[in-house]
Regions:
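Structural motif
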Residues: 47, 56, 68, 75-77, ...
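A cytosolic small-molecule/anion-sensing beta-strand core signal
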Residues: 44, 72-73, 89-90, 108, ...
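Ligand-binding loop in jelly-roll beta-barrel domains
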Residues: 98-126
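Conserved short histidine dyad/triad with adjacent acidic residue
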Residues: 33-34, 47-63
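Short acidic-glycine-tyrosine-enriched beta hairpin
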Residues: 82-98
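A short, N-terminal "cap"/entry segment at the start of jelly-roll beta-barrel domains
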Residues: 1-49, 128-129
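Well-ordered beta-strand positions in beta-sheet-rich domains
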Residues: 50, 85-87, 101-103
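Short, conserved beta-strand element in jelly-roll/cupin
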Residues: 52-53, 62-81, 115
Length: 129
């Protein structure tokens, strides 16, 4: 399969909102287009990211870290190896365990919060399928 990242993928791992700062999700949603991934804040040893999805992301995995997806706007499907795809609608979440191949897909623009270990590689650190 040897998939590549979407041509318009942009990842900003710089923390935008430090502690004791209001995180303005509506402003972030206005300011970004798909496929944008913004690190919002750090909580202990985890990062909270906002992703704007539209279309298919490549299959990938995070060898040593779990990844939590929570839909704020729109709807996504998570293809996960060795199980049926999981459809997530607004205010639904799902955790993909470490070392499991997965890919998010969204037929239309969707906004997703992700909670991941600090230092995770958002595009995956395992081989793409």
């Amino acid at each position: 399969m040897n998939e590549t990242l979407p041509a318009n993928f942009h990842n900003n791992e710089d923390v935008k909102y430090g502690q004791l700062r209001l995180v303005d999700i509506p402003a972030e949603l206005r300011d970004h287009v798909p496929w944008f991934n913004q690190t919002l804040t750090i909580v202990n040893d985890a990062v909270v990211r906002l992703g704007i999805f539209e279309g298919d992301f490549p299959w990938h995995k995070h060898v040593d870290q779990d990844e939590f997806f929570f839909v704020l706007e729109g709807e996504i499907e998570l293809d996960v190896e060795n199980r049926e795809a999981v459809r997530l609608r607004v205010h639904e979440g799902f955790t993909v365990p470490k070392n499991v191949m997965h890919r998010p897909r969204s037929p239309k623009r969707s906004a997703v919060l992700m909670v991941e270990s600090l230092g995770i590689v958002p595009t995956g650190d395992g081989p793409m399928a």
